[in-house]
Swiss-Prot record:
Membrane-spanning residues: 4-24
Protein name in UniProt: Nitrogen fixation protein FixS
Origin superkingdom: Bacteria
GO biological process terms held by the UniProt record: nitrogen fixation
UniProt function note: The four proteins FixG, FixH, FixI, and FixS may participate in a membrane-bound complex coupling the FixI cation pump with a redox process catalyzed by FixG.
Organism: Rhizobium meliloti (strain 1021)
Length: 55
């Protein structure tokens, strides 16, 4: 029972820290462009100004 006195506040503080990190990510715009990465991975990179390397 003595360990619960330490574990409960630690668990609550870690949960609060995770919530603060999530809210910071929302506020800083981390979730603004969800489709951009999926389109960039499909891009060939053959645009102007980019050099394409072939083997």
């Amino acid at each position: 029972m003595n360990t619960l006195i330490y574990l409960i506040p630690v668990a609550l503080s870690l949960g609060g820290l995770g919530l603060v990190a999530f809210l910071w990510a929302l506020k800083s715009g981390q979730y603004e462009d969800l489709d951009g990465a999926s389109w960039r991975i499909l891009d060939d990179g053959d645009g102007e100004g980019e050099s394409s390397q072939t083997l």
